[in-house]
Amino acid sequence: MSGPGPREPPPEAGAAGGEAAVEGAGGGDAALGEPGLSFTTTDLSLVEMTEVEYTQLQHILCSHMEAAADGELETRLNSALLAAAGPGAGAGGFAAGGQGGAAPVYPVLCPSALAADAPCLGHIDFQELRMMLLSEAGAAEKTSGGGDGARARADGAAKEGAGAAAAAAGPDGAPEARAKPAVRVRLEDRFNSIPAEPPPAPRGPEPPEPGGALNNLVTLIRHPSELMNVPLQQQNKCTALVKNKTAATTTALQFTYPLFTTNACSTSGNSNLSQTQSSSNSCSVLEAAKHQDIGLPRAFSFCYQQEIESTKQTLGSRNKVLPEQVWIKVGEAALCKQALKRNRSRMRQLDTNVERRALGEIQNVGEGATATQGAWQSSESSQANLGEQAQSGPQGGRSQRRERHNRMERDRRRRIRICCDELNLLVPFCNAETDKATTLQWTTAFLKYIQERHGDSLKKEFESVFCGKTGRRLKLTRPDSLVTCPAQGSLQSSPSMEIK
């Protein structure tokens, strides 16, 4: 068979073929409605095929028949057609197919239906071939009007051809059954490996590429999280491969995704040559598995856990050095921050407690100094007890450190609340219902105004009365106290003066 065109009928069937051709040309579709050639769709289960699909299938069948040794397959099919074609059945089908303007359809389309033991295999082969052609040719536009008539005539011709093939299944069913597996397997292999020729007049938006379409289909549908159509042996091999790779290197990326083919070992600080080789081997193994249609199991994951754990350990060691609480220490020149670290020694613990107690002893001379002094003394005693408990307890123990931190935080908040209550009584525009942020804002504005009015004289006087290192009030002699007391009185009476 040299081309996709219809073959000439044998000499003994020539006259009948000519009559059928004349009848088909004159009567349109009348040849398709003969009572002797009518078959139900449940018996044959034929499907519609567009011109593009039929042209592709015809090219594939022609190439397979040319590749067959000594034309054995073609001879068998011709003998089956000669034995089955009645006086006007096969030739009438050829004439009807040629008249409609579409490519002719003849019984070569269903060679597997010639077997007597499996008469329904023609439907299965048609469905498989149609699905493969649809996946390769893409979305082909269907024509209307004359195209529908041509398709109907092609379907009628296919029915006639399939009927003739079914009629020949009786005497010649056994020799033709041997040709079925070879044709079917070779067709599937050709679809999977060798790209078919493009159609002469494609109706799609772009010419089809069967090989690229199949490769893209395999690449896109095979999602790593799903396992589709993979035998159990391949699953076991894939799992064993993953286990071996995991045992070889634990800090590297064991089995990379196709999109992420970079080497994850190069980012780690302690990477060596074996880890790099194992990661590159895993990438190559994955590429081979992709071509062999091996999916990845659902329970597959990336081995990033140990790197994350090492990072957590590094961050944990850094957090031990970070300060737990930052306390403001009143210095001689400026304000400096004292960091209380977790791994502090006993001597540093004592110094910190002394500084915090010193800050708690800051008192102002005035009418409400007694109540404030009691509050500060209670906070000082609680801090002393806290320091003793921290010293007596063991250095280790996460629960003890957490409890100590919670106590210190509660005490800090309590002291902030006491100071804000004091400021609400001293600072203008503040009362007991004012929140802490608003109180601090009014306090800042009030102190700036005092500095504008009085300059640094009050600041220097305050520094001379209180110790900058301990925060305690200096013990002054009688004449000094007589000199400083009016100044302090003017300091406390300044809010009322400013309000006026």
UniProtKB/Swiss-Prot annotation:
Biased composition (Pro residues): 1-12, 196-210
GO biological process, one term: spermatogenesis
Coiled-coil annotated residue ranges, if any: none
Tissue expression: Isoform 3 is testis specific. Isoform 2 is pancreas specific.
Domain bHLH: 400-450
Biased segments, Polar residues type: 370-393
Region (R1 epitope (recognized by Chagas's antibodies)) location: 481-500
Any single GO CC term annotated in Swiss-Prot or TrEMBL for this entry: nucleus
Annotated spans, Disordered: 1-34, 191-211, 365-410
UniProt subunit comment: Efficient DNA binding requires dimerization with another bHLH protein.
Functional summary from the UniProt entry: Putative transcription factor. Isoform 3 may play a role in early spermatogenesis.
Name of the protein in its database record: Transcription factor-like 5 protein
Species assigned in the record: Homo sapiens (Human)
Lineage, uppermost ranks: Eukaryota, Metazoa, Chordata, Craniata, Vertebrata
